[in-house]
Design a protein with these regions (language model features):
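Bacterial N-terminal signal peptides
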Residues: 10-20
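Bacterial N-terminal signal peptides that target proteins for export
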Residues: 1-10
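A "functional boundary" signal
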Residues: 23-214
Length: 214
C-alpha cells in the first residue's frame, strides 16, 4: 500500500512539474509575440493582428511607448490611413523630444513626419519637420536621413509650383549620396534618380529626364 501511495505521489509531482514547465514555455512563447522585432516582421502582412499585439504590448509594457507609437504609425501608413499614421508618428516624436535620450530615433520620426505631411499636402508642416530634421541629421552625421529630408523639401517645392527650387533640392539630395558605399544609400540614390526623372517627365522635360543619372 505504501508503495502505491508513493507511486501516486510521485506521479502527481511529475504532472505538477510538467504542467509548470508547459505553462512557462507557453508564457515565453506568448511574450515573444509582444516584441518590436516580431511585430515589425508581421505588420505588413497582418496589420490588424499587429495592432492587437501592440495594444497587448502597451498593457504588458514589453515595448517602450515611443516604439509602440512608431509601429502603430507604420501599420496605419501601410493601410493608407495617413492621418492616423501622422498622429502616432507625432506621439512618438513628442516622447523623444521630451526625453532627448535617443536622438537617432527622434531623427527617424522627424523624417517620417516630413514624409507623411507631404502625403497629406500639409506643406508648411512638412517643411518645418524637414528643416529641423536636416540640422539634427547633420549633427548625427546621417547622410541618408539628410538626403531624404532634402528630397522632401524638393517635393514640397514642386507641389507648390516652385519647380526650379524643387530641382535644386532634388540635386542636393542626390549629390549628398553620390559615391556612397552603403547598399541602403545606393538604393536610396537610385530611388531619387527615378523620382527626379518622373518629375521631369511630368513637366514635359523629357530631354533632361533622359540625362538623369548619366
Amino acid at each position: 500500500i505504501m508503495k502505491s501511495i508513493r507511486s501516486v505521489i510521485c506521479f502527481c509531482l511529475f504532472l505538477f512539474v510538467f504542467n509548470q514547465l508547459l505553462f512557462a514555455d507557453k508564457t515565453i512563447e506568448n511574450d515573444s509575440l509582444y516584441t518590436s522585432e516580431y511585430i515589425s516582421r508581421i505588420y505588413m502582412a497582418e496589420p490588424e493582428r499587429a495592432l492587437s499585439l501592440l495594444d497587448g504590448a502597451e498593457s504588458k509594457k514589453t515595448i517602450p511607448l515611443r516604439i509602440i507609437h512608431e509601429l502603430r504609425s507604420r501599420v496605419y501608413r501601410n493601410m493608407y490611413m495617413t492621418k492616423l499614421a501622422f498622429l502616432y508618428a507625432k506621439k512618438s516624436y513628442l516622447l523623444d523630444s521630451v526625453s532627448q535620450k535617443d536622438t537617432k530615433h527622434l531623427l527617424t520620426m522627424t523624417v517620417d513626419l516630413a514624409e507623411l505631411a507631404v502625403l497629406m499636402s500639409d506643406h508648411k508642416e512638412s517643411m518645418r519637420y524637414a528643416l529641423d530634421g536636416i540640422k539634427l541629421a547633420q549633427k548625427e552625421k546621417d547622410k541618408g536621413a539628410e538626403s531624404k529630408l532634402l528630397f522632401r523639401i524638393g517635393e514640397n517645392k514642386w507641389q507648390l509650383s516652385f519647380k526650379e527650387e524643387a530641382y535644386d533640392y532634388f540635386d542636393k539630395a542626390i549629390k549628398l549620396l553620390q559615391g556612397t558605399s552603403s547598399k541602403l544609400e545606393m538604393a536610396m540614390l537610385s530611388y531619387f534618380y527615378g523620382m527626379k526623372m518622373d518629375y521631369l517627365l511630368n513637366d514635359s522635360r523629357s530631354k533632361e529626364a533622359l540625362e538623369v543619372g548619366l
